[in-house]
Each structure stands twice: as structure tokens, then as C-alpha cells.
Swiss-Prot record:
Converts heme B (protoheme IX) to heme O by substitution of the vinyl group on carbon 2 of heme B porphyrin ring with a hydroxyethyl farnesyl side group. GO terms for biological process: heme O biosynthetic process. It comes from Wigglesworthia glossinidia brevipalpis. Keywords: Cell membrane, Heme biosynthesis, Membrane, Transferase, Transmembrane, Transmembrane helix. This is Protoheme IX farnesyltransferase. CDD domains: PT_UbiA_Cox10 (cd13957). The gene is cyoE.
Length: 288
């Protein structure tokens, strides 16, 4: 049973977001790391994401049971009651907030705003109704690196804005690719994702547009003076590979091809965002 309580906080998602949070923190620190601040920021962010994940599972339990990918989730099948899950999530939210008090007001505001957007605006209000819910959700998905960055800087500057662009633009092709791979799941659950409402061709066009926007944003971090030459080289290298993979999506519109292609877009999205997070952690410019 303990394993089920661990599973509903989605450890994989926490891990991925913590990598980007560390990236933002180290980019802002420029080698001068406040260890206590680092521990509080990373811990608070991880716990906040865990809380948001549980709230999301509770809200989505009726649609999770319909989808092949999510039908065995503990809350969906009743192994963990919604009331217990909500209490669990609320305790984690309070604990996260208390840890964030060790940072600064801006970091607290950004973290709580990201939580609010994900749980209330995306999960509760838009996911079942709007084809553009992914775009709204991308804003909350982009908050972890900004939390890490602003916990150090204590202000929202051009660096934070570029991070917002990078991680927001990344979220959309990442999510649309999942939509193509799990198209039938979302259709059965009546979730109006972009691939279902707009079709595969428009989805592929949008994936390319957002990948290019992501690519430009990653480069801007260099030209704004935040990162070094190694970052520029590898961000261009990985970015061009992702664009190349995306362009190949127009070879066919068959469902099986879309699933295979969507999986490639999805998998490489994880590779590239991990690479970017690591690069901003180690190849930063000082005195920015």
C-alpha cells in the first residue's frame, strides 16, 4: 500500500522537474551556491509537485479509469479514497509552503501561481473543455526552473523570462506528441486535445512551430549573456535534431506512422530538455 502512496505523487515527473529546478538555481547562482537555500528550494518544489499530482489524480479519476495508460491508478480504482488523497495532498501543499518561506516572496508567488494554474485552471476547468488547455498548462509546467532561478536572484529578469519561454514552448510539442501516441485513449475519455479536435496535420504544424520557438528561445539565453559557447553549440545541435525529427512527420498521415513519429518526438523532448537543464547548470556566465 505504501508503494501506491508513492506512485500517486508521480516520482518520474518530480525527478524531471527537479532537474530543471536545479538548472535554474545553478544558472542564477553562477558558482556561488547557497547550500541551505538550495535544499529548501529543491525540497519545497518536489513536495509541491507531489501535491499537485495527487490533486490532479483526484480530479481526473473518472477519466483515468477509461484510459489504458491510467486505468490502474490507485485513486481511479479506489485503492486510495479521494478523501484520503485530498488530505495527503493538502498536507504536502502546506509542508511545501512552509519550506518556501525560507526562500523569498517572489519564489513563493511563482510556486503558488504555478500550482493554482495546474490544479484549478488546467485540471479542473480547462482540460475537459478546451483544445487550448495544453497552452495554459505549459505555463505551470515552466515554473520549476523559474522557481530555482528566482530563489537565488530574488527578482524576475530577462533570464527568468527566457527560461519561461524555453520551458513553456517545450511543453507543447511534448504534450501534443503524447496526444498522438495516446490518441485513442483521449478520444475514449472525451478529452478535447489538439490532435483530436484539429487533426494530425495541424498538430504536426503546431509541433514544428513550437519546436522552432523553443529552439530560438534556447539560443537567446546565450545571446542575452547567460550561458557560454558550449551551451550554444549543444543547444543548436540538439535543437536541429528535434526539428529534423519533426519535419519527417509529414511523410505520412497514417495512424501507425503518427504513433511511431509521436513517440520519437516525445522521447527526444525528454532528451533535449534534460540536456538544456544540465547545460545551464554547468556552462553559465558570471556577473550577469
Amino acid at each position: 500500500m505504501i508503494i501506491k502512496f508513492i506512485q500517486i505523487i508521480k516520482p518520474g515527473i518530480i525527478f524531471g522537474n527537479i532537474i530543471s529546478t536545479i538548472g535554474g538555481f545553478l544558472l542564477a547562482s553562477q558558482g556561488d551556491i547557497n547550500v541551505n537555500l538550495f535544499i529548501f528550494t529543491i525540497s519545497a518544489t518536489a513536495i509541491l509537485i507531489a501535491s499537485a499530482s495527487i490533486f490532479n489524480n483526484c480530479i481526473d479519476k473518472d477519466i483515468d479509469i477509461k484510459m489504458q495508460r491510467t486505468k490502474n491508478r490507485a485513486i481511479a480504482i479506489g485503492l486510495i479514497s479521494s478523501n484520503i488523497a485530498y488530505i495527503y495532498a493538502l498536507i504536502l501543499l502546506i509542508l511545501s509552503f512552509l519550506l518556501f518561506l525560507k526562500t523569498n516572496f517572489l519564489t513563493i508567488f511563482i510556486s503558488m501561481l504555478g500550482f493554482f494554474i495546474y490544479v484549478f485552471i488546467y485540471s479542473l476547468l480547462m482540460k475537459r473543455k478546451s483544445v487550448y488547455s495544453t497552452i495554459i498548462g505549459s505555463l505551470s509546467g515552466a515554473t520549476p526552473p523559474i522557481i530555482g532561478y528566482c530563489s537565488v536572484k530574488e527578482h524576475f529578469d530577462i533570464g527568468a523570462f527566457i527560461l519561461l519561454c524555453i520551458f513553456s514552448f517545450w511543453q507543447i510539442p511534448h504534450s501534443y506528441a503524447i496526444g498522438l501516441v495516446r490518441y485513442n485513449d483521449y478520444k475514449i475519455a472525451s478529452i478535447p486535445i489538439f490532435p483530436i479536435k484539429k487533426g494530425s496535420f495541424k498538430t504536426k504544424i503546431n509541433i514544428i512551430i513550437y519546436i522552432i520557438a523553443f529552439f530560438i528561445s534556447t539560443i537567446m539565453l546565450f545571446f542575452a549573456g547567460y550561458t557560454g559557447n558550449n551551451y550554444l553549440f549543444f543547444s543548436i545541435f540538439f535543437g536541429l535534431i528535434w526539428i529534423f525529427i519533426a519535419i519527417k512527420g509529414f511523410k505520412s498521415s497514417e495512424e501507425n506512422f503518427n504513433i511511431i513519429w509521436g513517440r520519437k518526438i516525445f522521447l527526444f523532448s525528454i532528451v533535449i530538455i534534460t540536456a538544456i537543464s544540465i547545460l545551464i547548470s554547468i556552462d553559465y556566465k558570471k556577473n550577469i
